[in-house]
């Protein structure tokens, strides 16, 4: 299929998505993932209720898009027919490798992102050296330790493969290739267990999967996918640095973010947003405002004219991302209100809510730590997330997560919402989203220094409707609110996403190099 036809199909699908979004954000559900393979390009409509093509592969903003290839995984199956060792002498490791390959193909078909496998087997160190020599650019190496023998081949080969990633840096530039070891139970265990300490001693970032669940391999692949997407992400930091000289907004700190996560951060001035805001077609903004206005459960403070200005801000920020090939923004909204001479035409709360619902990442208060955390949730969990100001109630053992920018799309569904003003300033348009009671949520944040992530899980016990504080207030049960309170650190904000993603966050931390600390335990 030629490129022009691929592009035409992609554009038609995205046009359908845009229409569905405008119809009160009601997207028809798909019973199972649908995969379209166009040569080396994969387009997926996930079977989780989303009709939007994942931003992973095609990011369409104002008719501009980027096609992302699938993640490329090299599977290396290590084994030998030794006279002594596990599973038993003369074991058919090649037959076992074929079984693994079949299992991996089945696993791949159920993923919500495309994966390309390159399969290799090795029974001698010469095979290992050949694989290293022939290895092309890959996103990760998965090493399957099938046997443990008296010659210690699989142990020594596994250590040698750990060096592939470092050599890859010099060959291709950029980052170490993540290495994931899979222990074939009752076969590779004796070789694998001593390997853990050895790899830690050389500072290797790796995962060791010793599990009878193939879903753990799927989790690892999701981490690789997230890593790749972080390295292909760009955040637009909308602020005035001279007016907001916080250390974590400095060029030096942004360089650390690039080094750690591979994510590009670019400074943008408020005047650039205002210019695009003034260029937005009023009729287009009014149409979207009408849909949002009619879809609200209740309108309290804002007028329809306020909402039109809010949708113009949405279109302006979306155009800004398009022009800068970005998929995320972090806007210093409170700073704009407080100290900038450029008048702010409207609070960006609704714009951020819509962008997050749509699959982009939009963070307020120029919070880069939260923006990176939101990007992680976007790709690791496949979920919109939002920044919160936590309120801790030790009497009821809950934390209430408050903000004015919550996405309407949260917990795999479109939630009821009330149109409000922005609470801090008392003007503009904010949003009060009422999320489903009983759903599991993960609360997390990369904290200052980028070496640690704090995280917790809990169930939504309700939505609080009081005028004090930010508009959306999601009440979450925690294990120990007292411990949560006295252990709180890393700045005010937290990021909330639907689902329990602690295991994936922990695995990702082992590959990126951050420590996961549980809050409130």
Q: Language-model features: where?
A:
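Extended hydrophobic packing segments that form well-structured cores
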Residues: 428-521
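Long, internal scaffold/assembly segments composed of regular secondary structure
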Residues: 289-379
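Short, glycine-/small-residue-rich phosphate/pyrophosphate-handling segment
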Residues: 186-226, 378-405
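Conserved anion/nucleotide-ligand pocket segment
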Residues: 224-256, 260, 399-415
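Ser/Thr/Gly-rich flexible loops in soluble cytosolic domains mediating phosphotransfer, phosphorylation
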Residues: 180-200, 359-377
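N-terminal, intrinsically disordered, basic low-complexity segments enriched in Arg/Pro/Ser/Thr
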Residues: 1-9, 14-64
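Metallocofactor- and cofactor-centric catalytic cores in central/energy metabolism, strongly enriched
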Residues: 65-193, 217-225, 251, 255, ...
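C-terminal catalytic subdomain
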Residues: 356-464
